[in-house]
Curated annotation (Swiss-Prot):
Main subcellular localisation: membrane
Listed GO biological process terms: L-cystine transport; lysosome organization; phagocytosis
GO MF terms, alphabetically ordered: L-amino acid efflux transmembrane transporter activity; L-cystine transmembrane transporter activity; symporter activity
PQ-loop domain residues: 125-191, 266-327
Protein name: Cystinosin homolog
Compartment(s) where it occurs, according to its Swiss-Prot or TrEMBL record: Lysosome membrane; Cytoplasmic vesicle, Phagosome
Protein family per UniProt: Belongs to the cystinosin family.
Protein encoded by which gene: ctns-1
Residues exposed to the Lumenal side: 20-123, 185-207, 260-263, 317-337
Catalytic function, reaction form: L-cystine(out) + H(+)(out) = L-cystine(in) + H(+)(in)
Pfam families xrefs: PQ-loop
Length: 404
């Protein structure tokens, strides 16, 4: 047998050689109401001996859940009934050890023999949490479209700050790569599991979809800036400098990973820092731009309303989850998530005040906005020259006023 063929056979057979006598729990996430019960199934996979069918499995103990100390395997399965004693966000039930035929050495691989059990206050709250979660996911996902539609309708991006757009693109690019690696890359997931054993996955498929979709939406909006009227707007030198710093930080982290100075998980984490920095900075340019123009024309209030809805519901979901399991650690153990959500809501309120209170009757200097047709500036000048006559002023053309 040639070496390449033998090598391929070894690669193919190695997983099956070592993936034997595994004790597994298929349903890793379980949820029960306090005082309720749930059955947890342990199963032996790829067994190599009939004697394993009489294995005694010792289980971990927790003050939040009640169950027998040990269970016996029957027909390669062992079931245990767990009672929810106290509210908890995720108690771990795991196989600690096992014995077979009086042997003190456990012949089973117990690495995957665990389940996370959440004891909740109410199923109604659990359903409400899911509804709120999907609602804010939907609100955030479509929040990019009002601005794109407004740009398309006006054939203009005047009023949309380019610093905000540029920072948003950098932030969501980093966030998309972060989610893709955390969800799909096996090395990243293995490193995360080593650092955070028995923890639920930090990134779900909907996180990946949202991040990639947000990046594409930002990219399309920037393409609109290349083709539509933009007046003399450009990306400021301060924004360019900040983006260079953020991108350089990402590349340096990537280089350190390639040179094995840091782990791949550390590089992925650095991408989340870029997103956090962008979120803290990106709203300032647009808010100041609206202030200097004394107008929010060109800046979609629909985008803000949807973002405000998503941010508010996100925090509401955190509150409902905390109430349902009597665990408020999400607010102080992970202050970054709560803080970034609060920053977004704070600026959304500022934008709403600017739009509805400070500058509600701003003049529209462009061709169309909210269905109101406005005179072309060139036509105004030409008509003024034609009909001014002896008039000393060309101020006869009044601006169109938009009343929201």
């Amino acid at each position: 047998m040639s070496f390449p063929v033998a090598f391929l056979l070894v690669l193919f057979l190695v997983p099956f050689t070592f993936a034997t006598n595994n004790l597994v729990v298929r349903q890793k996430e379980l949820e029960i109401v306090i005082g309720g019960e749930v059955s947890v199934n342990f199963q032996i996979k790829n067994h190599t001996s009939q004697s394993l069918n009489a294995t005694r499995i010792s289980l971990s103990q927790s003050p939040y859940i009640s169950h027998p100390d040990a269970i016996l395997v029957d027909n390669w399965n062992a079931n245990v009934t767990v009672l929810g004693s106290q509210l908890v966000s995720g108690a771990i039930l795991e196989a600690l050890n096992c014995t077979t035929d009086g042997s003190i050495t456990c012949p089973l691989d117990l690495e995957d023999a665990f389940a996370r059990i959440t004891v909740i206050r109410s199923h109604f709250l659990a359903i409400l949490i899911q509804i709120v979660g999907w609602t804010y996911f939907f609100a955030w996902s479509i929040s990019f479209y009002p601005q794109m539609y407004l740009n398309f309708k006006r054939k203009s991006v005047v009023g949309l700050n380019f610093d905000f757009l540029s920072l948003n693109l950098v932030g969501f690019c980093a966030y998309a790569i972060f989610n893709l690696l955390m969800y799909y890359n096996s090395h990243v997931k293995n490193e995360y599991n080593i650092v955070n054993p028995r923890s639920p996955p930090p990134v779900l498929l909907n996180d990946v979809v949202f991040a990639v979709h947000a990046f594409l939406a930002c990219f399309i909006t920037i393409l609109q800036c290349l083709f539509y009227e933009r007046d003399n707007q450009s990306v400021s030198s301060k924004c360019i400098a900040l983006m260079i710093v953020l991108i350089s930080f990402g590349f340096c982290s990537a280089a350190a990973t390639v040179l094995r100075k840091i782990q791949l998980l550390s590089f992925v984490t650095s991408l989340s820092y870029i997103k956090m920095a962008v979120t803290c900075c990106k709203y300032f340019p647009q808010a100041y731009f609206n202030y200097t123009r004394k107008s929010t024309v060109g800046w979609s209030i629909g985008n803000i309303m949807l973002d405000f809805t998503g941010g508010t519901l996100d925090i509401l979901q955190m509150i409902l989850q905390a109430v349902n399991v009597n665990d408020w650690s999400a607010f102080y153990a992970n202050p970054v998530k709560f803080g970034l959500g609060f920053v977004s809501i704070f600026f959304d309120i500022i934008f709403m005040v600017q739009h509805y209170v400070l500058y509600p009757n701003a003049e529209v200097p462009h061709n169309e906005y909210h269905g109101v047709d406005n005179p072309n500036p060139d036509n105004i000048a030409r008509d003024a020259e034609q009909y001014a006559g002896d008039s000393e002023s060309m101020e006869s053309t009044e601006p169109i006023i938009v009343h929201d």
